[in-house]
Amino acid sequence: MSEITAAMVKELREKTGAGMMDCKKALAETNGDMEAAIDWLRAKGIAKADKKSGRTAAEGLIGVSSEGTKAVVVEVNSETDFVARNDAFQDLVRGIAKVAVSTNGSVEAVAAATYPASGKSVSDTIKDAIATIGENMNLRRSVALSVEDGVVATYIHNAVSDGLGKLGVLVALKSTGDKEALNAIGRQVAMHIAATAPLAIRPEEVDAAVAERERNVFIEQSRASGKPDNIIEKMVEGRMRKFFEEVALLSQAFVINPDLTVAAAVKEAEKAVGAPIEVAGMARLLLGEGVEKEETDFAAEVAAAVKG
């Protein structure tokens, strides 16, 4: 059996809100597998779905830029928030986002593209910035969306400067209608995506592995009721329908008007746009998502320094 450390228990508690002893038991029952331990706690009714903790330990900025019917969102990381607030760093991220619009949006393509202000590649420009600012930084993620006819709306939540912040969203809308009205509903949908973090646009587009994991948890929860298998099957199907409604963009309650689903709000907007609207794509980047900084034990660090 894998050793269950205090750090593992702490991480599981932060992800699930479950008690320390429950977390320790869950890890022991699942041989230290964090994801399996989360499912074990959920199946026992002790914890809700893992929200990926919401912790954004990495510093830096998210930048968005658009040109015509194409837009990009990029994430550039730094070591400290102090550097993220630096004008030179902000100009760099804004510049990288503008360069990214002319590429296919992949990190590799953006890194290899020429940065106009330096005449060098984006990758080499970042290296120069590291030497100048004195702190490590990197282009971590980049996503591009485009449509042949329509708009790609952008949104930065709590912007620190024009096109820069810690959470950026793109939403691609296909339509032959009025572009100004289309961009207005696009921005509202982008704000909704920022708030709700949907997993997919439509229920059938939710990752099959994610859906199967939820189904297995619901089966275990339903079995605990002691009801017959045919009733359990109906219970699971009902819970899966609710799950898809909660994680698929178009079936979610629209945050700006909860009386409507997002699909209904988009349909309503077709009146102002003057043509049908299709939600063709979305991207949501939260700064530091999936990255954890190594936590420093300050007392241990001082003790080590004193010992030389």
UniProtKB/Swiss-Prot annotation:
Function: Associates with the EF-Tu.GDP complex and induces the exchange of GDP to GTP. It remains bound to the aminoacyl-tRNA.EF-Tu.GTP complex up to the GTP hydrolysis stage on the ribosome.
A Pfam family that the UniProt record links to this protein: EF_TS
PANTHER family per UniProt: ELONGATION FACTOR TS, ELONGATION FACTOR TS, MITOCHONDRIAL
Main location: cytoplasm
PROSITE patterns in UniProt: EF_TS_1 (PS01126), EF_TS_2 (PS01127)
UniProt entry keywords in alphabetical sequence: Cytoplasm, Elongation factor, Protein biosynthesis
InterPro entries: EF-Ts_dimer_sf, Transl_elong_EFTs/EF1B, Transl_elong_EFTs/EF1B_dimer, Transl_elong_Ts_CS, UBA-like_sf
Subcellular location: Cytoplasm
Family: Belongs to the EF-Ts family.
Region (Involved in Mg(2+) ion dislocation from EF-Tu): 80-83
HAMAP family recorded: EF_Ts
Protein name: Elongation factor Ts
GO cellular component: cytoplasm
Molecular functions per Gene Ontology: translation elongation factor activity
Classification via NCBIfam families: tsf
